[in-house]
C-alpha cells in the first residue's frame, strides 16, 4: 500500500474528514491556528501508530509505556510505526546535555577509554603501570608497622546477584569478602539485588606490615592482582583509609594512578567518573555574599534577608559578634575589615557563632515551610564547581588525552569545530589505534554532521539540555533520528522551523528530505512558506479555527494549493494575499535604553541602544546571542531594578535609560497555569465580570448569592464531589490514570443550586463551554465583557473555549492570552514588553492579526521588543537590531542597526539579504 488512508477523523474539532497521505514523501499539514492540524497529525496519526505498536507488547512492558487512548477515527489503513518529534518535551534533567541526548557522548566515552593516553594531572607525564614488586615496595614504605587488609576488587559497581562467584570464592579457600563496603563471611552474604550495582572485594590477607613479612606480602599482592585483573587495594584496619594500586597506570613522580580505563570513567552520571565534589553536575548552588549584602548600610542592617520578618532574629547575634570583635555594629559594612566581614558571613568556632551563610544554607535544607525556602532561594546562585571547573568529571578522567585534548576540551567546542577535530584525528591515527577507532570516529563524525545540517553547529556537546529552546531540542532529536537510520517509519514533526533563521531553513529541509529518502514518511505541521514550498504533498485544514475549522480545505502539490480558490495558504504563497509593509515607520524619539559592554555567553563586549516608543525586532541566526542579550541581561537587570528581585544578571557593565519606563513585562510561552482550574476566562479576568453579572440577576439576589458563589475554586457554589474540577482522577495499574466525568455534576463543576441561576437562558457552566466568538455575541449588551473578549478575538483566539483548561493550551496560545491580558489593562503607556518568537504556531493570516496587536501596544506609548525570525514581522518593525554574523563563538556582535530598509542594504547582514525580497522595491532606494 503506497498511502496511509484515514477515514472519518473526528478527534477534537475534526469534522469527520477523510485524508490520504502518500507514503515515503515529505507531507506538510498547514492551516490557521486552531484548525485541527495537531489533532490530525499528533492526536490521530501518531496516537494510533503508537497505540497499535504498544498493544503488541506484553502487559509487563506496557506498564512502563502507558497506553494511549484510541483516537476518534473510523479507520486508518497502511499505518507505519510512528515516532513524534514535538516541541513540548524539553529536558528538565540537569544531567542531560546535547552530547547525552544525541548519544554522541557514549561514543566519545568508548573512544577515550580505548585510544586515550592517561597523563598525570600534576606534571603532565604519561602514566605507566606498576609491577608486583614495585607495589610491594610502596606498601612496605608507606604502611610499615601498621595492620592492613589486602583486598582484591573482583567486582566494581556492576549489577547482578553474583551467587556463582561467591561459591567460587569458597572453593578457592577464602572465607571473607567486603560487599558494598561491609566486611562479611562468604557463607553469610545475603542475596544481592540483581538490579542494583554492587562492589565485591576479596579479603586475601590481614597482617602487620614489616620487612620480615615481604615474602608473604608479595604472594598476597600477586594473588590480588591475578583475581582482579591487575588491581590491589590496601585498607588500613585502624583508620579505614584505602589506597588502590594498579599494575597498569601510575605516575612515577607523583604516585598518581588511574584504575583501568573504561567507558564509565568518562561518565559524569556514574560514581566512577563523576567529580566527587559536585557529583557530576558541574555546578554548585551557594548563597552569594554579593547578593546577600548591601555594603553601603550599617553592618547590623547590611544583610538584606535579616530585614525581612522571618530572619530578623539574626540581627542581635550579628551585632553581638561585631562587638566581640571590637567594632561598632553601626559602622558601614564596607568599612569593616575583611576578617570581621568573613566572620559574620562564615562564622567562628572560637566565638561560637555559626555564620550567616552556613546558617541560611542549613535552614534551607532543613526547613519545611516553602515560603521560607523561597525567601532564601532568592540569594542562592549557581556557580561552576571549584574542583572540576564545570567539567563534571573527576581529575583522573580529565587526565586522559587524545591528540592533547581531554574529553571535556572536545565536548566544550562548538559542534562544527569538534567535527573538524575528529576529521583531522581520523587522518592522524595509525596502526592498532586506527583499527580500534575507525568505526567509532566514522559514527561520531556522521552524527556531528547531522547536528551541523539542522543548523546547530553553534551548540557545544556539553551544553545543558535544560537551557535549550523547544525548537533546538526538536532539531537535536531530528538529528538523532537521522543517526538511527530507521526506515519504514512515520515521523510526525511540529513546526521544526521554529527558532531557525531563514538562512538555515534550507539545511533543515534537506534534513527532512534525508529522512524521507531513507524510506520514511515525514509529516510536518508547518507554517513556514519555504518549508511548505519544499513539500511533496500539502494538506490544508480550515477554513477557520475551533468549530469553524476541522475541514479538509485543499490537498495536493504546492502548485495545486497555490491555484486552489479556497486555500488561504495558497493565496499567501501565490501573492494574492500579503501582509502589507507599513506606510510609514515611527522615528526614534531620542530616548533609549542603553546596554553597555554586554559580554555574557558569546556576546563580544557590545553596546546596544534600544529606542523607546518603537516596535523593535532583535534578529540574527540561531545562537547569535539574541536571548542572552534580551533575557539574561536586559530582562533580569530591569526586573531587579523595578521589582527588587535578586536575579542573576548576565555579564554587563550597566544599563542606562530605565528611568524612562515604568515597568518591564515578559510575555513568554510558559503555561498560564499548571492545573485545569486555570483557563482563559480566569486569566484574563473576564470571568470576574461574568460572575458579577450572574450575581446581579434577580434570582441570585433573592437567594443572597455573591460573585464568589459562581467560582469553581471555593466552597459554596462548586460541586464538592469533584471540588470544582468536573472530573475525578482514577489511578490505574498497567494503564495511565483515567479521568472520569464527575457523576454528581456531570462535568459542569457547580452544584445544582448554582446552576439554577441563568442569564438569557444560560447558566454559568454553559458560559464556560462557549467559545470566545460565541460569548462575544451572547454578551452583546455588556461593553466591559465584550471589550476583553474583543481583544482575545484580535489576537486570533476567537475559537478557544472560555473554560478551556490551561494544560491543553499550546505555548503560542498561552502567549497570546497573556498578550490579550496586557492589552486589556488601562495602560500607563511607559511599559517595555519583551516577546520571544510570538509567531510560533501562527499561520500567515494569524501573523497579520498579531502584528496589528503589537502595533496597538506601541501606539499606546509602549515599547515592544520582539526576538523574531519571521520576515513578515521583521519587515513591519520600526527598528531592527541584527546580531551575528554567525552562531556561537562566531556570533555575539552587532551586525546591523536601523530601519528594515537600512538593514536590507547592509551587505554583512544575513537578515538583510532575506529581507530584501519582502520589502517593496520602491522602498529600497539607496
Swiss-Prot record:
Subcellular location: Cytoplasm
GO MF annotations in UniProt: ATP binding; ATP hydrolysis activity; DNA binding; excinuclease ABC activity; zinc ion binding
Main location: cytoplasm
Residues engaged in binding ATP 2: 620-627
InterPro entries, A to Z: AAA+_ATPase, ABC_transporter-like_ATP-bd, ABC_transporter-like_CS, ATP_grasp_subdomain_1, P-loop_NTPase, UvrA, UvrA_DNA-bd, UvrA_inter
Mapped zinc finger ranges (C4-type): 251-278, 719-745
Binding-site residues, ATP 1: 31-38
HAMAP family: UvrA
Quaternary assembly: Forms a heterotetramer with UvrB during the search for lesions.
Protein name as annotated: UvrABC system protein A
Species per Swiss-Prot/TrEMBL record: Aquifex aeolicus (strain VF5)
The gene coding this protein: uvrA
Amino acid at each position: 500500500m503506497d498511502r496511509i488512508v484515514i477515514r472519518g477523523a473526528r478527534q477534537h474539532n475534526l469534522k469527520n474528514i477523510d485524508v490520504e497521505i502518500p507514503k515515503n514523501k515529505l507531507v506538510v499539514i498547514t492551516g490557521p491556528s486552531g484548525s485541527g492540524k495537531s489533532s490530525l497529525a499528533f492526536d490521530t496519526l501518531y496516537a494510533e501508530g503508537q497505540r497499535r505498536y504498544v498493544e503488541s507488547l506484553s502487559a509487563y512492558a506496557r506498564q512502563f509505556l502507558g497506553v494511549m487512548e484510541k483516537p476518534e477515527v473510523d479507520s486508518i489503513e497502511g499505518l507505519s510505526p510512528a515516532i513524534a518529534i514535538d516541541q513540548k518535551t524539553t529536558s528538565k534533567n540537569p544531567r542531560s546535555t546535547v552530547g547525552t541526548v544525541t548519544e554522541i557522548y557514549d561514543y566519545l566515552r568508548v573512544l577515550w577509554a580505548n585510544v586515550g593516553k592517561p597523563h598525570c594531572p600534576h606534571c603532565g607525564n604519561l602514566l605507566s603501570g606498576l609491577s608486583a614488586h614495585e607495589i610491594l615496595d610502596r606498601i612496605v614504605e608507606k604502611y610499615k608497622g601498621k595492620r592492613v587488609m589486602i583486598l582484591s576488587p573482583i567486582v566494581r559497581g556492576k549489577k547482578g546477584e553474583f551467587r556463582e562467584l561467591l561459591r567460587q570464592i569458597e572453593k578457592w579457600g577464602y572465607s571473607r569478602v567486603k560487599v558494598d563496603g561491609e566486611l562479611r563471611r562468604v557463607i553469610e552474604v545475603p542475596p544481592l539485588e540483581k538490579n542494583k550495582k554492587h562492589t565485591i572485594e576479596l579479603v586475601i590477607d590481614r597482617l602487620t606490615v614489616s620487612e620480615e613479612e615481604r615474602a608473604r606480602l608479595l604472594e598476597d599482592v600477586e594473588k590480588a592482582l591475578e583475581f582482579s585483573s591487575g588491581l590491589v587495594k590496601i585498607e588500613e584496619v585502624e583508620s579505614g583509609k584505602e589506597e588502590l594500586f594498579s599494575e597498569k597506570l601510575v605516575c612515577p613522580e607523583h604516585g598518581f594512578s588511574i584504575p583501568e580505563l573504561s567507558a564509565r570513567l568518562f561518565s559524569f552520571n556514574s560514581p566512577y567518573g563523576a567529580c566527587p565534589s559536585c557529583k557530576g553536575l558541574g555546578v554548585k548552588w551557594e548563597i552569594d555574599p554579593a547578593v546577600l549584602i548591601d555594603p553601603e548600610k550599617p553592618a547590623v542592617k547590611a544583610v538584606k534577608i535579616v530585614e525581612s520578618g522571618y530572619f530578623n532574629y539574626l540581627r542581635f547575634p550579628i551585632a553581638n559578634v561585631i562587638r566581640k570583635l571590637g567594632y561598632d555594629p553601626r559602622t558601614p559594612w564596607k568599612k569593616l575589615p575583611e576578617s570581621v566581614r568573613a566572620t559574620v558571613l562564615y562564622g567562628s568556632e572560637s566565638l561560637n557563632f555559626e555564620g550567616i551563610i552556613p546558617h541560611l544554607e542549613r535552614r534551607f535544607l532543613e526547613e519545611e515551610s516553602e515560603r521560607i525556602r523561597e525567601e532564601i532561594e532568592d540569594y542562592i546562585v549557581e556557580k561552576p564547581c571549584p574542583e572540576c571547573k564545570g567539567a563534571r568529571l573527576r581529575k583522573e578522567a580529565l587526565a586522559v588525552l587524545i591528540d592533547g585534548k581531554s574529553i571535556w576540551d572536545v565536548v566544550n567546542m562548538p559542534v562544527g569545530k569538534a567535527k573538524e577535530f575528529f576529521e583531522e584525528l581520523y587522518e592522524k591515527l595509525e596502526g592498532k589505534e586506527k583499527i580500534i577507532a575507525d568505526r567509532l570516529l566514522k559514527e561520531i563524525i556522521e552524527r556531528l554532521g547531522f547536528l551541523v545540517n539542522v543548523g546547530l553547529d553553534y551548540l557545544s556537546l556539553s551544553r545543558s539540555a535544560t537551557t535549550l529552546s523547544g525548537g533546538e531540542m526538536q532539531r537535536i532529536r531530528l538529528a538523532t533520528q537521522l543517526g538511527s537510520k530507521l526506515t519504514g517509519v512515520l515521523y510526525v514533526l511540529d513546526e521544526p522551523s521554529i527558532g531557525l533563521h531563514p538562512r538555515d531553513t534550507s539545511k533543515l529541509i534537506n534534513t527532512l528530505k534525508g529522512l524521507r529518502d531513507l524510506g520514511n514518511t515525514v509529516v510536518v505541521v508547518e507554517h513556514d512558506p519555504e518549508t511548505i514550498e519544499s513539500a511533496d504533498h500539502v494538506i490544508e485544514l480550515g477554513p477557520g479555527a475551533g468549530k469553524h475549522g476541522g475541514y479538509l480545505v485543499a490537498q495536493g502539490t504546492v502548485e495545486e494549493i497555490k491555484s486552489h480558490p479556497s486555500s488561504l495558504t495558497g493565496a499567501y504563497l501565490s501573492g494574492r494575499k500579503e501582509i502589507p509593509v507599513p506606510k510609514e515607520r515611527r522615528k526614534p524619539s531620542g530616548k533609549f535604553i542603553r546596554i553597555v559592554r554586554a559580554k555574557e555567553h558569546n556576546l563580544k563586549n557590545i553596546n546596544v541602544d534600544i529606542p523607546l516608543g518603537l516596535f523593535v525586532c532583535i534578529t540574527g541566526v540561531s545562537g547569535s546571542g539574541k536571548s542572552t542579550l534580551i533575557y539574561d541581561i536586559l530582562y533580569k537587570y530591569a526586573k531587579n531594578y523595578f521589582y527588587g528581585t535578586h536575579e542573576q544578571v548576565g555579564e554587563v557593565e550597566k544599563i542606562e535609560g530605565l528611568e524612562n519606563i515604568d515597568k518591564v513585562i515578559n510575555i513568554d510561552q510558559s503555561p498560564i497555569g499548571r492545573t485545569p482550574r486555570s483557563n482563559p476566562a480566569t486569566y484574563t479576568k473576564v470571568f470576574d465580570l461574568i460572575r458579577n453579572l450572574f450575581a446581579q440577576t434577580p434570582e441570585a439576589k433573592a437567594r443572597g448569592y455573591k460573585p464568589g458563589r459562581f467560582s469553581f475554586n471555593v466552597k459554596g457554589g462548586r460541586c464538592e464531589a469533584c471540588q470544582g474540577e468536573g472530573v475525578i482522577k482514577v489511578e490505574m495499574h498497567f494503564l495511565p490514570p483515567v479521568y472520569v466525568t464527575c457523576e454528581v455534576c456531570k462535568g459542569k463543576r457547580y452544584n445544582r443550586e448554582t446552576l439554577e441561576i441563568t442569564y438569557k437562558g444560560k447558566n454559568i457552566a454553559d458560559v464556560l463551554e462557549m467559545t470566545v466568538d460565541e460569548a462575544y455575541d451572547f454578551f452583546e449588551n455588556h461593553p466591559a465583557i465584550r471589550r476583553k473578549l474583543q481583544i482575545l478575538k484580535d489576537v486570533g483566539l476567537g475559537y478557544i473555549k472560555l473554560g478551556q483548561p490551561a494544560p491543553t493550551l499550546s505555548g503560542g496560545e498561552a502567549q497570546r492570552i497573556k498578550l490579550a491580558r496586557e492589552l486589556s489593562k488601562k495602560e500607563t503607556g511607559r511599559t517595555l514588553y519583551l516577546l520571544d518568537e510570538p509567531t510560533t504556531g501562527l499561520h500567515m493570516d494569524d501573523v497579520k492579526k498579531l502584528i496589528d496587536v503589537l502595533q496597538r501596544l506601541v501606539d499606546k506609548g509602549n515599547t515592544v521588543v520582539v526576538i523574531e525570525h519571521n520576515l513578515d514581522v521583521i519587515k513591519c518593525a520600526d527598528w531592527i537590531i541584527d546580531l551575528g554574523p554567525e552562531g556561537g563563538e562566531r556570533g555575539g556582535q552587532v551586525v546591523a542597526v536601523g530601519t528594515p530598509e537600512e538593514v536590507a542594504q547592509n551587505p554583512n547582514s544575513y537578515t538583510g539579504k532575506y529581507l530584501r525580497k519582502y520589502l517593496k522595491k520602491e522602498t529600497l532606494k539607496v
